[in-house]
């Protein structure tokens, strides 16, 4: 499960820097249910 800082770090790792868009719904989903790298890469 990715919440808070862990979620942001996973996005930065997957997207490579600041090229990502925030998605509150995805953040909540990842925190509650967990996310795969594919789920996170959608935000890039």
UniProtKB/Swiss-Prot annotation:
Subunit composition and interactions: Heterodimer of a B chain and an A chain linked by two disulfide bonds.
Source lineage: Eukaryota, Metazoa, Chordata, Craniata, Vertebrata
Disulphides: 3-31, 15-44, 30-35
Pyrrolidone carboxylic acid, modified sites: 1
Record GO terms (molecular function): G protein-coupled receptor binding; hormone activity
Family recorded in the similarity comment: Belongs to the insulin family.
Keyword flag Transmembrane: no
GO CC annotation, single: extracellular region
Coiled coil regions, renumbered to chain: none
Entry's localization field: Secreted
Protein name: Relaxin
């Amino acid at each position: 499960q990715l919440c808070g800082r862990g979620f942001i770090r996973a996005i930065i790792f997957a997207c490579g820097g600041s090229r990502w868009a925030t998605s509150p719904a995805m953040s909540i989903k990842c925190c509650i249910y967990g996310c795969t790298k594919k789920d996170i890469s959608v935000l890039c």
